[in-house]
């Protein structure tokens, strides 16, 4: 009888050890939850009125390790149930881009963690630059307002094709060829001040006034990638455009 009791005691002890070890292994196999960093800023600003292509940009205080968890914490809603997708542009910056454009004159609600903000869209003011036609056509809510002669990037410095949006408006901007790798002493070098500049890309593409290329506008592409307009046309577009308005470049 003592042998049976001793045998059962050993079996129970081994079972408890194995169970404890299994729990320990299972616990170790589950990665700890990563905390979601705090929110540094949300763009567009609360209450802003922007163009229909403006993405929602959320900047966090520190780099994000669990991107899916962060994406799940961001809530975008409109009366039209606009669909879109996330794009990470830096380790702590994510943007939500509508698949097409926001509907004009729509309220967009943005929730991030405990924050709830919102902005509105204005008219659908769309600028279309045609590389082959050498034109820049602006329409508002489907109605063409003006088709302007333009000069885009020359073959060695082509204007990128795609869908963009007006990122900022600068009454004057200094353009320095060294920022795109061209020395000032090169035959292609330049250092000049451009007026009525609307930023298209962070790499330095603008729609801007270019009195030096007026004779080529409508006929030839001679710029370093920017969309050149006459001073009058550039001033007109500068006054009409809102940050977030779509800018499309076609072949």
Swiss-Prot record:
It holds the Pfam family Big_10. GO terms for biological process: cell wall organization; peptidoglycan-protein cross-linking; regulation of cell shape. Keywords: Acyltransferase, Cell shape, Cell wall biogenesis/degradation, Peptidoglycan synthesis, Periplasm, Signal, Transferase. Induction: Up-regulated 17-fold under nutrient starvation. Imipenem binds at residues 208, 224, 226, 228. It is found in: Periplasm. GO terms for cellular component: extracellular region; periplasmic space. GO terms for molecular function: acyltransferase activity; peptidoglycan L,D-transpeptidase activity. Is irreversibly inactivated by the beta-lactams carbapenems via the formation of a covalent adduct resulting from acylation of the catalytic Cys; ertapenem and imipenem are the most efficient drugs for in vitro LdtMt1 inactivation. Cephalosporins (cefotaxime, cephalothin, and ceftriaxone) also form covalent adducts with LdtMt1, although the acylation reaction was 7- to 1,000-fold slower and leads to elimination of one of the drug side chains. A high drug concentration (360 uM) of ceftriaxone is required for full inhibition of enzyme activity. Is not inhibited by ampicillin. Its EC number is 2.3.2.-. Residues 125-250 form the L,D-TPase catalytic domain. Residues 1-28 form the signal peptide. InterPro entries: Big_10, LD-transpeptidase, LD_TPept_cat_dom, Transpep_catalytic_dom. Substrate binds at residues 190, 203-204, 228. The keyword Amino-acid biosynthesis does not apply. Pathway: Cell wall biogenesis; peptidoglycan biosynthesis. The keyword Transport does not apply. The active site is at 208 (proton donor/acceptor), 226 (nucleophile). Generates 3->3 cross-links in peptidoglycan, catalyzing the cleavage of the mDap(3)-D-Ala(4) bond of a tetrapeptide donor stem and the formation of a bond between the carbonyl of mDap(3) of the donor stem and the side chain of mDap(3) of the acceptor stem. Is specific for donor substrates containing a stem tetrapeptide since it cannot use pentapeptide stems. Is thought to play a role in adaptation to the nonreplicative state of M.tuberculosis. Consists of two domains connected by a short loop, which form a bent shape. The N-terminal domain (residues 32-122) resembles a c-type immunoglobulin (Ig) domain, and the C-terminal contains the catalytic site that is located in a tiny tunnel. Monomer. The peptidoglycan structure of stationary-phase M.tuberculosis is atypical since it contains a majority (80%) of 3->3 cross-links synthesized by L,D-transpeptidases that predominate over the 4->3 cross-links formed by the D,D-transpeptidase activity of classical penicillin-binding proteins. In fact, 3-3 cross-linkages predominate throughout all growth phases and the ratio of 4-3/3-3 linkages does not vary significantly under any growth condition. This is L,D-transpeptidase 1. It comes from Mycobacterium tuberculosis (strain ATCC 25618 / H37Rv).
């Amino acid at each position: 009888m003592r042998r049976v009791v001793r045998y059962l005691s050993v079996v129970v002890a081994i079972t408890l050890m194995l169970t404890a070890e299994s729990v320990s292994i299972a616990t170790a196999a589950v990665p700890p939850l990563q905390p979601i960093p705090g929110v540094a800023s949300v763009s567009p600003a609360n209450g802003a009125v922007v163009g229909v292509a403006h993405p929602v940009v959320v900047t966090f205080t520190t780099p994000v390790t669990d991107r899916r968890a962060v994406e799940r914490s961001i809530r975008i809603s409109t009366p039209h149930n606009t669909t879109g997708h996330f794009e990470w542009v830096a380790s702590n910056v994510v943007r939500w881009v509508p698949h097409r454009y926001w509907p004009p004159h729509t309220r967009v609600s943005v929730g991030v963690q405990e924050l709830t903000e919102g902005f509105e869209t204005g008219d659908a003011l769309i600028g279309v630059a045609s590389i082959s036609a050498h034109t820049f056509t602006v329409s508002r809510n489907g109605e063409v307002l003006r088709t302007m002669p333009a000069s885009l990037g020359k073959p060695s410095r082509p204007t990128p094709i795609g869908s963009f949006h007006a990122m900022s408006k600068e009454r004057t901007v200094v353009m320095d060829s060294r920022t795109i790798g061209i020395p000032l002493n090169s035959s292609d070098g330049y250092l000049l001040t451009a007026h009525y500049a609307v930023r298209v890309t962070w790499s330095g593409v603008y729609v801007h006034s270019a009195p030096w290329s007026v004779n080529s506008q409508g006929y030839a592409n001679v710029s370093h990638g920017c969309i050149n307009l006459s001073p009058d046309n550039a001033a007109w577009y500068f006054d009409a455009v809102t940050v977030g308005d779509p800018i499309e470049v076609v072949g």
